[in-house]
A protein has these predicted regions:
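Walker A/P-loop nucleotide-binding motif
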Residues: 100-116
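Interdomain "pre-motor" coupling segment immediately N-terminal to P-loop NTPase/helicase cores
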Residues: 16-67
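Post-Walker A helix-loop "phosphate-sensing" segment adjacent to the P-loop in P-loop NTPases
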Residues: 121-134
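N-terminal pre-Walker A segment at the start of P-loop NTPase domains
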Residues: 70-94
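Short glycine-rich substrate-engagement loop in P-loop NTPases that contacts/grips substrate
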Residues: 81-89, 131-160
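Loop/turn-to-beta-strand initiation segments
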Residues: 101, 128-130, 161-164, 191-198
Length: 258
């Protein structure tokens, strides 16, 4: 069997990284001195790393992050915000995911909620968990359109699938009874099976009022399913008079900032 035949078969088996590495080995005279087991191990390592890198890229692309460049290591703890660094560091281990616990990120407009949520999402991708980012207004429209078209059950199935679901602009506007009912169905499907990151301008204590004015039993049902044992990150300003928007801190496009 010729070397080219071996390379062709590797390519047909979609082992392209291994094929490229094998070709390089064949062109390198010094490789003749390397034992077969070591050379073969090198080829396997290259193919393995390539596949993991491709998988990570695919997970990041499918997550549809609002801020795909967000990074935990780039979080600025000197930007005039009170941030619990110990808690943030703990959450980067992604243990909250295996515990099926949620994260609440609250703070004013421009405080960096979306950036932090996307950074947590990126860490989850690096641990090879599936992630999905969605704005609550878009989510509600999707669910209602599905309800109206008779495809609610089908559409509902796609939201429990991500291991981590990031819901941005959480309760920015008060929910109607119909919106709360649709949202309850989704949250119930995810309960104790996955983790959800909620980003809101309102503190948790104000969420009841944003769900049908706090008068519907759906408010209790939704809050009961998301608040128990959740991690809370409240991004507070140390000195509001000296505040910088996080879009300035991270150099983001103002049109993309939340």
């Amino acid at each position: 069997m010729t070397n080219q035949s071996t390379i062709d078969k590797l390519i047909k088996m979609r082992l392209t990284a291994m094929a490229d590495a094998f070709r390089i080995q064949m062109d390198d005279p010094t490789m003749k001195e390397v034992p077969f087991e070591d050379r073969f191990g090198m080829l396997v390592d290259i193919e393995y790393s390539n596949r993991k890198n491709n998988r990570l890229k695919r997970l990041i692309r499918q997550a549809e992050f609002e801020q795909p460049d967000a990074s935990i290591v780039a979080i600025d703890y000197q930007s005039g915000r009170k941030l619990n660094k110990a808690l943030i560091s703990r959450l980067t281990t992604c243990e909250y995911i295996t515990e099926y616990r949620n994260i609440f990120i609250t703070g004013a407009t421009g405080s960096g909620k979306t950036y932090m949520a996307c950074a947590f999402g990126m860490e989850a991708c690096k641990h090879y968990y599936t992630v999905r980012y969605v704005r609550l207004p878009d989510l509600l429209l999707d669910l209602q359109a599905a309800r109206d078209s008779g495809t609610f059950s089908t559409v509902l199935k796609k939201y429990p699938k991500p291991v981590v679901l990031i819901i941005d602009e959480w309760l920015l506007l008060k929910l109607t009874e119909a919106e709360a009912r649709n949202l309850f169905e989704l949250i119930h499907k995810r309960r104790k099976k996955s983790s959800t990151i909620f980003c809101s301008q309102f503190r948790e204590s104000e969420w009841y009022q944003q769900i049908c004015g706090g008068e519907s039993t759906l408010a209790d049902a939704i809050m009961d399913r998301i608040s128990y044992d959740s991690y809370k990150i409240d991004i507070e300003s140390i000195d509001p008079s000296k505040d910088l928007s996080m879009r300035e801190v991270y150099g983001l496009d103002p049109a993309m900032a939340k």
